């Protein structure tokens, strides 16, 4: 990884013109795109509160944590903002297999002038810190404790990073930015949905300047997103179908909160359902293979009832079709 370390933002963009959000704020951006800049999704719909929080991270070097249920577009939100700013963006999935060595770096044997020599290869963290890069830690609440304490060193905006193996202190690039996404807010999982997440040290949570929540959207907003991705549904009949799909999803969310079911439909699931319905030309079958088959057998009849309420059609899993 060797992008131009001296590269820096050279233009300013209006948030109102770039993201369609009513704000007079301007944000630094790059005029040229590098290989680390994500591709722009022209159909992406931005959530106002989440967008303002993330842009504050870019504009004012704030550490921003985006928390919310699965499938709501947390990581994509950061990526799509970075794409429009031409800001290099690197995502790291902080699963349990990511170790300190992966982040910091390690000694490796390399050939130099025909001889084997030991050379320290920097990990993703030291490299990112020294470059104008937006580093995004996905699944932040699933990271191992030893890894989390490595990250804690760079959570302060002016915090230097010490490479003990090299007796070297790395200063942060002026345009290095740090973001993270998580399903929980660092207090552990009380829902049972997110196995593998854990409580986060509150001293570390305190270092995040901004914590924004991106959960399920209103029916109109969710429909806007799905229709933007599925333009063939942007007609009277298609809108009615998508509206009913979102109503089914809303019932699963209410059912989950009430304790009736243990699985919920995320906006991502609804999007997949809409896409699969166009593939199979069968809304009911698409619902079953997209979501229902992932659910507990005991709960399938309840979820099939949600479908029947919205679409007026029975599924094979419905109570009326179950033979005793």
Report residues per predicted region:
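Short, hydrophobic/amphipathic alpha-helical patches that form generic packing surfaces
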Residues: 52-60, 271-276, 288-293
């Amino acid at each position: 990884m060797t992008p131009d370390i001296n590269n820096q933002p050279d233009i300013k963009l209006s948030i109102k013109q770039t993201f369609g959000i009513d704000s007079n704020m301007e944000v630094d951006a790059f005029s040229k795109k590098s290989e680390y800049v994500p591709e722009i999704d022209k159909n992406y719909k931005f959530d106002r509160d989440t967008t303002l929080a993330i842009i504050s991270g870019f504009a004012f070097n704030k550490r921003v944590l985006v928390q919310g249920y699965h499938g709501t577009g947390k990581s994509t939100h950061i990526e799509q903002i970075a794409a429009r700013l031409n800001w290099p963006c690197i995502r790291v999935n902080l699963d349990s297999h990511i170790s300190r060595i992966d982040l910091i770096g390690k000694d490796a044997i390399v050939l130099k002038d025909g001889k084997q020599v030991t050379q320290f290869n920097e990990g993703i963290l030291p490299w990112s810190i020294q470059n104008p890069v937006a580093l995004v830690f996905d699944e932040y609440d699933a990271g191992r404790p030893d890894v989390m304490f490595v990250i804690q060193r760079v959570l302060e905006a002016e915090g230097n990073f010490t490479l003990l193996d090299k007796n070297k202190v790395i200063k942060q690039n002026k345009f290095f930015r740090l973001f993270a996404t998580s399903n929980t807010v660092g207090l552990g999982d009380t829902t049972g949905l997110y196995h593998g997440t854990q409580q986060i040290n509150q001293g570390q949570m305190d270092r995040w300047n901004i914590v924004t929540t991106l959960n399920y959207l209103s029916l109109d907003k969710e429909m806007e997103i799905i229709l933007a991705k599925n333009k063939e549904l942007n007609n009277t009949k298609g809108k009615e179908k998508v509206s009913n799909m979102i109503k089914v999803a809303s019932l699963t969310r209410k059912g989950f909160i009430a304790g009736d079911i243990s699985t919920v439909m995320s906006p991502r699931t609804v999007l997949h359902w809409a896409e699969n319905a166009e593939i199979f030309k069968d809304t009911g079958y698409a619902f079953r293979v997209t979501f229902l088959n992932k659910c507990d057998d005991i709960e399938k009849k309840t979820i099939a009832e949600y479908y029947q309420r919205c679409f007026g059609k029975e599924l094979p899993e419905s109570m009326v079709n179950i033979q005793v």
